[in-house]
Amino acid sequence: MRIGLFDSGIGGFTVLKKVIELCPNNSFIYLADTARLPYGVKTNNEIKKIAEEISSWFRYQNIDAFLVACNTTNAIALDVIKNNLDIPVFDLIGSAASNIQESRVGVLATPSTVRTKAYTNAILEFKPKTFVIEQPCPAFVPMIEMDNINSDDITDVATGYLQPLLKQKIHSLILGCSHYPLITSSLRKVLPSSVKLIDPAEALSFKLKFFIDSKTRNYSKNKNFVDLKFYVTSNLKNFSNKAKHWLDVFPEVNLVSLQKKGWVS
């Protein structure tokens, strides 16, 4: 199958890695809208416009399923994407919310995601008595995209973001931005070992696997086969280097303009 997914930058790598682990032997098309990152401080209208452009581009990529690997877009413009695509769309927020077991849940997310209370609303839909507290983290994505991941600086920032959640004695912490699993080690320095970390990509990956298995039961079992194609809207060389580092692949990366109809495909 051909699976499409996108993010503003490298955050979606965390989703891609989880999906490849569970769903090898498929083709993946990854679009990084690097020209407009970070999404987490944009307005709802800006995010909806971006979602319209990205989903329109993917309509021409002959994909069988689409993964919203960006929580901010998921929170604000999931309906835009679903209305623009006539294929199954898998989202991070709904996938994570449906699997929550704990009664006190913290969420780290971008300011735009927190503003929508998308995680709170989704969790309460499945488990109405859950206590949920969301914390905006505007500094994380820029620091991660600049490879400032294992430094004391990001640990200090994480400490400030986590204190309000720890005061509420949370049992689990949702990483509500696909960039955040890249700083798990820094978060663990601050969090008590009793707090469970939840990566929404895990639940999404299982949902995708169930879908693929139900549609394709005779595919190759060679787990070494993965077909990857990458597209970016800017900073091609920088993105390529990051893909080599985080995914251990030497990808062909193409530059694409989402505002023009002369799309690369």
From Swiss-Prot:
GO molecular function term, any single one: glutamate racemase activity
Enzyme class: isomerase
Pathway in which this enzyme or protein is active: Cell wall biogenesis; peptidoglycan biosynthesis
Positions annotated as active site in the UniProt record: C70 (proton donor/acceptor), C177 (proton donor/acceptor)
EC number: 5.1.1.3
Sites where the protein binds substrate: D7, S8, Y39, G40, N71, T72
Superkingdom field: Bacteria
Catalytic activity entry: L-glutamate = D-glutamate
Keyword Cell wall biogenesis/degradation (UniProt): yes
Key words of the record: Cell shape, Cell wall biogenesis/degradation, Isomerase, Peptidoglycan synthesis
Residue ranges that the Swiss-Prot or TrEMBL entry lists as coiled coil: none
Keyword Cell wall biogenesis/degradation listed: yes
Signal peptide positions (record): none
PANTHER family given in the database record: GLUTAMATE RACEMASE (PTHR21198:SF2)
Protein name as it appears in the record: Glutamate racemase
